[in-house]
Each structure stands twice: as structure tokens, then as C-alpha cells.
Amino acid sequence: MGLQALSPRMLLWLVVSGIVFSRVLWVCAGLDYDYTFDGNEEDKTEPIDYKDPCKAAVFWGDIALDDEDLNIFQIDRTIDLTQSPFGKLGHITGGFGDHGMPKKRGALYQLIERIRRIGSGLEQNNTMKGKAPPKLSEQSEKNRVPRAATSRTERIWPGGVIPYVIGGNFTGSQRAMFKQAMRHWEKHTCVTFTERSDEESYIVFTYRPCGCCSYVGRRGNGPQAISIGKNCDKFGIVVHELGHVIGFWHEHTRPDRDNHVTIIRENIQPGQEYNFLKMEPGEVNSLGERYDFDSIMHYARNTFSRGMFLDTILPSRDDNGIRPAIGQRTRLSKGDIAQARKLYRCPACGETLQESSGNLSSPGFPNGYPSYTHCIWRVSVTPGEKIVLNFTTMDLYKSSLCWYDYIEVRDGYWRKSPLLGRFCGDKVAGVLTSTDSRMWIEFRSSSNWVGKGFAAVYEAICGGEIRKNEGQIQSPNYPDDYRPMKECVWKIMVSEGYHVGLTFQAFEIERHDSCAYDHLEVRDGASENSPLIGRFCGYDKPEDIRSTSNTLWMKFVSDGTVNKAGFAANFFKEEDECAKPDRGGCEQRCLNTLGSYQCACEPGYELGPDRRSCEAACGGLLTKLNGTITTPGWPKEYPPNKNCVWQVIAPSQYRISVKFEFFELEGNEVCKYDYVEIWSGPSSESKLHGKFCGADIPEVMTSHFNNMRIEFKSDNTVSKKGFKAHFFSDKDECSKDNGGCQHECVNTMGSYTCQCRNGFVLHENKHDCKEAECEQKIHSPSGLITSPNWPDKYPSRKECTWVISAIPGHRITLAFNEFEVEQHQECAYDHLEIFDGETEKSPILGRLCGSKIPDPLMATGNEMFIRFISDASVQRKGFQATHSTECGGRLKAESKPRDLYSHAQFGDNNYPGQLDCEWLLVSERGSRLELSFQTFEVEEEADCGYDYVEVFDGLSSKAVGLGRFCGSGPPEEIYSIGDVALIHFHTDDTINKKGFYIRYKSIRYPETMHAKN
């Protein structure tokens, strides 16, 4: 039966039932053929200032790209902009069709416009229907700049820990499915998802109008959303989106994809060709893994297809002549797991244990464990359960403080959780019990001693006394079905003087009219004899619960028959602020909410900056000469859907200036959502000074007339802190006779100032200019120096000096950007001299003149002296040069201690990535070297294989090693045998730390010892 013979009803049934294609993933759009977005369906949780993928600069399928991505991403300059059907563009990574594509943000249109805006330059070319499809140009391939979350350290979640928040408008089953997807990643990798506490960076599951989309990797500097929109709440889709969060691009964009699949461009929907661009080797790191047809990150065969039976991606046949299936959305593939484990450097030994009971043992048990082994087990059970760990055998090498071979058990989800114990030797440890639902077990061996190893069993127990002010309680095995024949009793106690608040996120317990079988019982007190609040079962979430004291008693019971998904609840300390005499400090209305309260105002009023008092609505007519304007609610976040207009009017012949003291609005340079507009004049038809959003404080603006219009608008989503601005009306003194200034007059609010050009300073009379002194001392690690009066000609009879000092252990480099000094064969007239030290008596590095840009110059130490001299005759433009620092060099040690620092910005910033620095320390003849670490903080790893400091007893790395060091805390002093030592500092491209500070000196000591590795 042909495609045309299928009725619309049959087509719809085929799509929904999944028969048409192997996997369907509509992303940044809905799967529904008649997709429309109801504003009432948007996330209704308490506003969180998150990075919203739906407001990204552009989309690449379901991947949100921001300005940082665009600045380092280029596409072919021959894409046709004129014939693209922008109205039909959407954001999907699934199957056929363009039904219901949101028209608000056409992906290709956005992509081209943004790249054009940053200067890529797009040309028209008839490459659409019936023409050659767009492809990467050779030039753009050469010009690609490396980019990939997997190779950019800031995109990797530290320690593999990803805090999360789930928006409040998701159903219980959706929440359970999100947790199942996260547990799926945890089960097979060393990535850990944990409910957010006070972490700055975390993900927020939201329901956004653009459907399903996410950024790739960690964005940092606050929360970021993962949008799970309409018809995207499927297990496989969420696992896929979490793959982007973890740091993965789509498999079919790998650089080697043409060896494995064929892109059939004539079958691609017009305007969606860019979704099939492939990345360059420097842009994505496949971590040495083979191309993975089975990856959950792979497109399906008919993604963005013109017709449901037309392939856009055709996999190559295998050795048996069979084309492998692609685009599955069921589970992680072996390749997905291998790549994730490499990306997050998971130990080769250990696993994540999620069953209610189980066992673990050292490798090779009971026949002995290998040396230099590192294993990590993560035990993760249901919140509300505790983990009981019992070691059945212990036979490890015994050492002081268990320094060599040991087992560490921690009460939590990662290596920084509280330590329950560190064990070695042959004494079996006692029973260990966690305080919550996670436990970290780490085993390390570094000796060659052969023992049996260890074996342990664990069990999850539900119930118990909980003394916390907030936390989670879930039925055993949640989000999977609870187990039969369970009885769990919890007694929750919060701080004295408070109540216990309990809210349910999910609830599904076997239904019965009187809850006679499976049920949850909640009592207002500390025991089963306390007053009954409710006995709950069925599928309806119970109402929020508030105890009358600081204690709440809960009991969950399941029988031996029907099992359901169970429940998930949050508890916290609660008080009714509105019941207090001052009603929480609210001026007009107090609204108590569980866990908090809100002040409200009568109609015609809005909350003031303190969020308690009420004042007239924002905006208005301002006739004062000066004053302050703030966003509604300042200094708290401004409310949504606000439109405030201030009309500022000053006397005639006056001008109005506005200066922002603080500025933080949603948005970037597009300013489509929340923004401030400033006009010279009374209406929006007047002269526009600018439209502003984001976090950059606008420049001071002065009106052209005696009135100014300031308009603020916010949309219904993300709110920020807003702005605080001061306006001031004054006459423009610079408009008459340049304000009496010899060079430049700058009008300021309420006054004016005179300024002088480069090479001159302001006279004591504050109006005239005189030549400046030419002596500067520079201590910054990088910057510019210029000849006097730059970029105009330098003055005659001038002598200027610069002394540049860098942090000890670093050399100064001088690179010239422009150079034009009077020419002479021996530079006898005007010239620039550079010395290798702090004075003109130091060795000279160069004497420069003429118009040829000199080669860069480098000092041997951390100081450089520069002198510029001009005579009485010819003047030229002069020079502009950049000074910077480089690590390493030859350092002379004396009996007086000297200092050496790991990087130029030590103390201000962490060391940068991809460093390889070598310092050669030479002592006085007949002496040795003493190295004393004053500060040491370098990325920690068992073998110091990532970032490390290595010391050698000689001229090169072939000499005897005195130690390789990493981690936190200074190593012991190091003594050389000879009079020369080499220090090598290496960093990779991921985690950066504070660095190190070494004090070294020359000593005469006959019995020095090598430091131990």
C-alpha cells in the first residue's frame, strides 16, 4: 500500500505506535501532530534563575548553543539563506515530519543570523531544492577552532557529581521516570546525580515550550535547565538528554562518521541540513572508542526526513551484509558506557550497587589482590533507607595509619563525604551504618604484599529515627515498585520550636477503600499512639501535612500481593509566620505557605524593595533634579510580567544623565525577554539611547533634551535582581568653550572634568595639560606599554623608563604590536633599549629603532628594564608592546632562601591547563640544594598522572628522580645529592588547583637524604 493510500488517522496511528521508525524523538518540539503550547502548561515552580536552553542563541537539533559555542563554531559560508522555509523550522532529533514546529525560533535562521553577526559572513548560493546541499567548505574546515564538551574542562562536572532539581509541575510518574533515567547512568558509570543542596551549579528539570533540549556539559556559574517538554517524557529520551548534560554530542557528528554511515541529503527536510554537519577532530573527542551504531546518542535512519519511509542516515553493511539498527532509545550502549567512563576517568574496578542487598570483594578474592589497584563501589538505595555494611573477611597489608593498602568507607555519595572508617590488616571491622541512603567504599593497594583481600555484604534497612531539618523519604525500591512484606517506621524530628512539614511528589500505593492492605500511616507525634493525621493509599497525592510539634511519625506497610511504585516525599522544618503578632512583617496581607510565607498587597499596590511593605505600582512622572530608580522589588528579584515607564523631566537647557549602580537582567545582547530601554524624549518615538539586558552595567547616558524616558519590561519566566540607577539633571558645561579644558572636556553628572592625551598629565589648575613623567613600575603579569603620546607622535627630548617585575620563577616576554622610531644604522638618535634585569646596568637584550617590528624578547629572570629616548629632532609614531610572563628558566640558589611560584597569577587564580614548565636550580659550587614547599595544592590522583610536580637530581629528566607529587598539603623537604636540580610542573586540560610555592636555597650539609616517592 503506497504512502498516499494511508489515511491521516492511519498515519497518526503508525507514528504513535512506533511502527514507522525505530526510535522517535521530537526535540524542542512536540511529538503531537497538532502541537500547540498552552502557556498554562509551562513550568509553574518557584522561579529559579537558570540558564534556559529554550532561550539559547541557536539550536543544533536538541542541543542548545550559546554565544560561547558560536564564537568557536563555524559552518559553510555557502548555505542559502534566501530559500529556507523558516516558518517550518524546529528543533528535533527524532523522526520524520515538521508538524507542529514552533515558529518562534527557527533553528537554521537563528544559526545563520548569529554566525553572521559574529562575522563569519554568509553568501547566497542556490543550494536548496534540486541543488547541491550545504556542506563544510575546505576553508572553514581549516579555520575550525577546537571545541567539545568532552575536551573542555569547564564542561565536565567535577567529581562526576551532578546536583539536580525537579520542577514542581511534573507528575509523580514523571519524577519517578527521571530518577530511573539518572539511576541508569549511575548504574553503568561513575557519574552521580544528587538532589541539590547548596551547590552553585546544578541542573533543573523543567517543562519548557521548546520541548526537549539541553546544553552539552556543565555550563557553570549557576543552574542550567534540561527541558523535558510535551511528549518527551520517555525513559530513553530522558537518558539521551542526560547524555548531553554529561557532556556528549550526537554520535553521527563524529569526524569519522563518513566511514560508517552515508548521509542522503536529498531526503533531508529543507532547512534541516545543518543538523547533519560533522565535527572536526579538534571539536569532539571520541576518546578512542569505535563508531557506535547502537549509541543512545545516535540519530535514527529517518531523522528530519522528507517522508516517513525515506532514509536520511544509512548505516554501512557489516561483514554479514546487514545494516545495523541505529537510533535506539532504550538503554545505554556498551560504547556509551565506555565513553562516559573514560570521560569521567572512572576506576577500572568497582561498580554502583543499587539492589537492597549485595556483596563486594577485592579483585582476585580470596586468592590475593594485585598491587596498585584502585576500586570504588557506590552503594545507592532508596532515600529513607540506611545501609548496613558488614565485612566478612579482612586480610590486607597492615601499615601505620593504613597508609599503603586500605579500605575507606564514607557516609555519602563521594570521596568528600564524612569518613566512617579506614581499615587495613587482618582485623575485621565492625558493622558500619550510613546515616542516609548512600555509601562510598574505596579500596587502594600500593604494596606487593599478597593477602586474601576483603569481602563484605551490605543490606538496606528502612525506617529509623531521623534528626534533620530537611530531607527525603521514599518507599523501599522507589522509583521502582516497592517490595512485598515490608514494614518501615520513621520518626522525623526537626529543631525545637518548629513543626514538621511534609509534601508528596509522587504517590501510588495499592488502592483499597479503607487502605486495609498496602498503606502509609502518618501520625502527629513521636509514636504509633500519637493522633492520626491520615492513612493513605491509592493514586491521589495526599495534601501537604503540617505537624503540631517538632515530631512526625510515619509507617509504610506492604503485604505479599500487589506492589506499586510507592511514594516520594520531602520533609522540612515549618512555622506559621502569619500567625505571629507581626504577621511576618507584612504591611497588608500575609499568605502562609508550607515551608515559607509570602507578603501580598491590595489591588493597585505592589511589594516594595523589602518584600514586606506595599507601595504604588512602578513607574511615574519624576520632576526632581536628581533621584534613584530601581526595578520593582529591589534588591530582591523583580516580579514577572512587569512594564514600568518613568518619565524624567528637567528644566529647559538642562540635560539628564542616568548612571547604573547595579544591573542584572535576564538575557544577552538580543534582549528579547527582560530589558530596559532609554530614550531622549517623552515617548518611544524619540531618540533611542539603547536597549539593555544581561549583567554588563551600561555606560552613563545623557539625554539630548530636557526629558528622558526609561522603560523596563519583564516576561513571565526567569527573574533576576534587576537594576538600581541614579539620574541627575545639570547643564552641559562642555558645550561652551570646551569647558575651558586644553585637551578634552568630559561632562559628568553634576559637574565636568578635563582630561589629557597620552603622555600628558593634568595641570594643578585642572584645565591645562603638561608633559607627564616617564617612569613606571609594572607588577601585573601582562599588559601594554606605549611610547609617550601614543598613538600620536612622541614628543622630543623625552626619556621614559619602565621596570617590569613578575612573580619569582617566571620570565618576562616583550612582543611588539607596532613600532615606528626614527631610523639610524646604530640607533644613535631616538631608540628603545631593553635590559635583562631591573636596571640599565643589567645585560642588554636589544637596542631598537626604525620601522620594522622587532622580534619578541625574553628576559632570563623575572625582571626587565626598558628605556625609551628621543632627541630634539625627528619624531615618529612610537611603539606599542605587550608584556607577558612565561614559566620556567635557570635559577641560581644561594645560602639566602629564594622563592619560586607555580604560575604567574598564584594567589589570585588557579594554575592554567596544559602547562609544562621546567626550572633548573643551580647551587653554589660544592653545595647542595634544599627545596621546601610552603604551599602545595595540585590535582590529586593515585599515580599523580594528571597534574604533578616532579623533581630530578640533575640537569634533565633522565637524572635520578627525587619524587613526583600531587594532591593537597606540602611534601617533605627535598635535598639534592648534586649541585643541580630540575623541577618539572605538568598540568593536563581538566581540573586546576591553587598550585605551589617553593622556597629553595644552597646548603652545605654532608648527610642529606632523598625524599621518598
Curated annotation (Swiss-Prot):
Signal sequence, start to end: 1-30
Is Ribonucleoprotein tagged as a keyword? no
- Which cofactors are reported in the record for this sequence? Zn(2+)
Sample GO molecular function, one term: collagen binding
Which cysteines form disulfides? 190-346, 210-232, 212-213, 349-375, 402-424, 462-488, 515-537, 578-590, 586-599, 601-614, 618-644, 671-693, 734-745, 741-754, 756-769, 774-800, 827-849, 887-917, 944-966
The record places domain Peptidase M12A at 148-347
* Keyword terms of this UniProt record: Calcium, Developmental protein, Differentiation, Disulfide bond, EGF-like domain, Glycoprotein, Hydrolase, Metal-binding, Metalloprotease, Protease, Repeat, Secreted, Signal, Zinc, Zymogen
Q: Name one GO biological process term.
A: proteolysis
Q: What is its EC number?
A: 3.4.24.-
Where Zn(2+) binds, per the record, is at 240, 244, 250
EGF-like domain mapped to chain residues: 574-615, 730-770
Q: Where do the catalytic residues lie?
A: 241
The note on the cofactor says: Binds 1 zinc ion per subunit.
Q: Cellular component per GO?
A: extracellular region
Q: In which tissues is it expressed?
A: Highly expressed in brain and kidney and weakly in lung, skeletal muscle. A perceptible level of expression is observed in heart and testis.
What SUPFAM superfamilies does the annotation carry? Answer: EGF/Laminin, Metalloproteases ('zincins'), catalytic domain, Spermadhesin, CUB domain
Q: What does this protein do?
A: Protease which processes procollagen C-propeptides, such as chordin, pro-biglycan and pro-lysyl oxidase. Required for the embryonic development, especially heart development. Predominant protease, which in the development, influences dorsal-ventral patterning and skeletogenesis.
Q: What is this protein called?
A: Tolloid-like protein 1
Q: Could you read off the lineage of the organism from its UniProt record?
A: Eukaryota, Metazoa, Chordata, Craniata, Vertebrata
Q: Which gene encodes it?
A: Tll1
